[in-house]
Design a protein with these regions (language model features):
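Low-complexity, small-hydrophobic/phenylalanine-enriched stretches
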Residues: 1-12, 16-17, 22
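Extracellular jelly-roll beta-sandwich "head" domains, especially the C-terminal globular C1q domain
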Residues: 18-150
Length: 150
């Protein structure tokens, strides 16, 4: 048991740090921003992995005064930036959207900031129904120690 801080830069093996967070919601739809900041506080290169984030809007049934059936759609949009530069921007209705990424983080290049913004809208300004999975961020030392792929 270690009480306090342990610092080591020549570890044999793997060190992985993971953090997860749910996207903000307003009643029936996803709406809000998650900002991830990864400090450049290590002397080795790292990789940041974002496992798949799944998001979707929806298709809704509607009947008019003559009892005629029609449909309207909820739209869910996910926008992702890396240090202020857009790397992903997609909207979807009733088909699932997916974002996933592996980002190199060389040592000495400063803090990495990822911003994930989800927004929702409904046709005719109706209240949308959308969903998005939790965000998982995995940070690891960039190394092939003990792994061979051929």
């Amino acid at each position: 048991q270690i009480k306090g801080k342990l610092s080591a830069n020549q570890i044999e093996g793997d060190i992985v740090k993971t953090v997860s967070k749910s996207f903000p919601r307003t009643n029936s739809y996803a709406s809000g921003t998650i900002t991830v900041r990864i400090s450049d506080d290590q002397k080795f290169d790292r990789q940041v992995m974002i496992p798949p984030v799944l998001f979707r809007g929806g298709k809704h049934e509607n009947f008019n005064s003559n009892n005629q059936q029609s449909y309207w759609y909820s739209t869910c949009r996910l926008r992702v930036t890396r240090n202020g530069q857009e790397i992903f921007n997609q909207s979807t209705t009733d088909v699932q959207g997916v974002f996933s990424s592996v980002i190199d983080m060389p040592a000495g290049q400063g803090t990495l900031t990822l911003t994930f913004t989800v927004s929702s809208s409904g046709a005719n300004d109706w209240t949308p129904t959308t969903s998005i999975s939790d965000l998982l961020v995995v940070v690891m030392k960039k190394s092939t120690a003990g792994i061979s792929i051929s």
